[in-house]
């Protein structure tokens, strides 16, 4: 379900995932996807930081996918470790950050907004 600007949108169904990507492709919006898992300690550590980035950057679409909940999406995107952050624009992968690396996450977003 889509939420307000400046929030992380959790994709609980493949349909929601596809809808969000479609909208982002049409608007040429930068998308940052957090592939996460409920049991993943580093994922829980970085989640508040990811949410804070979403508040600070309302012109970027922040999505969250639980790899256990949407196994097919995680498989399609070849997710091997959590957290993995994918940076997408117009349906293309621009970049990827693996691990709870705050500085790298922030600098990669800045790079693709420049």
Swiss-Prot record:
One of its GO terms (biological process) is positive regulation of catalytic activity. Keywords: Acetylation, Cytoplasm, Disulfide bond, Electron transport, Redox-active center, Transport. The modification N-acetylalanine is found at residue 2. CDD domains: TRX_family. InterPro entries: Thioredoxin, Thioredoxin-like_sf, Thioredoxin_CS, Thioredoxin_domain, Thioredoxin_H-type-like. Signal peptide: none annotated. The record marks 34 as: Deprotonates C-terminal active site Cys. Disulfide bonds join 40-43. It comes from the Eukaryota. Thiol-disulfide oxidoreductase involved in the redox regulation of a number of cytosolic enzymes. Activates the cytosolic malate dehydrogenase (MDH) probably by reducing an interchain disulfide bond of the inactive MDH homodimer. Possesses insulin disulfide bonds reducing activity. This is Thioredoxin H1. It comes from Arabidopsis thaliana (Mouse-ear cress).
